[in-house]
Regions:
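Nucleotidyltransferase catalytic core that binds NTPs
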Residues: 1-204
């Protein structure tokens, strides 16, 4: 079985959903690796984070991911100055870990060639792509040029965005079945009128 060295799984986790957790659980059960590190994004250049602050996202990530096998959660991007470009994050991880494998989804792969300093990314890390049906990745230019850098893995886990969960929070809708129990117990005590711009009373 191929050994993946250090697996890196990043995301806003705003909040972490049950799909995030199931993806990490599936990968940790399926792949052989030395380290598996989950890291919440710090200051992403192309999106403005809303709702949960960095401390809360990090705390929730530790609560839900560190229950899975030997997963570690890193605050590496919160400690970086400036925008959290992937190549900068990989430079930081490379100081401590060898044989990096960055995990991305299919949507991210399809726009991967547009990422900042993509050549640096490919020099610093291999890429593990969670494959989704309906896409012919073998015809993409980035794959044809760098076949040895990519590993595609079937992803049987359903997808659910944090945006979907945040919209439910803003509308006062129950999120019980879309996040883990620990995440739900933590979030249900938040005043989402204040932090998410919620205009509706809770319906749960």
């Amino acid at each position: 079985m191929k050994k993946f060295g250090t697996l890196l799984f990043g995301g806003a986790f705003n909040p972490p959903t049950i799909a995030h957790v199931l993806n990490v659980k599936y990968l940790s059960d399926t792949l052989c690796y030395d380290n598996f590190i989950v890291f919440p994004t710090g200051n992403p250049p192309h999106k403005e984070l809303e709702c949960l602050d960095d401390e809360t996202r990090f705390l929730l990530s530790k609560k839900v991911f560190e229950e899975i096998n030997d997963i570690k959660v890193s605050d590496i991007e919160f400690k970086m100055q400036g925008e959290s470009y992937t190549y900068r994050t990989l430079h930081e991880f490379k100081k401590k870990y060898d044989n990096l494998h960055l995990i991305i989804g299919m949507d991210s792969f399809l726009s991967f060639s547009k990422w900042k300093n993509v050549d640096d990314i490919l020099e610093l890390s291999n890429i593990v792509v969670l494959k989704r049906g309906g896409y012919d990745f073998k015809e993409t230019e980035i794959y044809l040029k760098h076949k040895d850098k990519f590993t595609f893995i079937d992803n049987p886990v359903f997808e659910m965005s944090s945006t979907f969960v945040r919209e439910r929070l803003k509308n006062g809708d129950d999120i019980r079945f879309y996040v883990t129990d620990k995440c739900y117990e933590f979030l249900k005590n938040f005043d989402f009128k204040e932090i998410c711009g919620c205009t509706q009373e809770k319906k749960y």
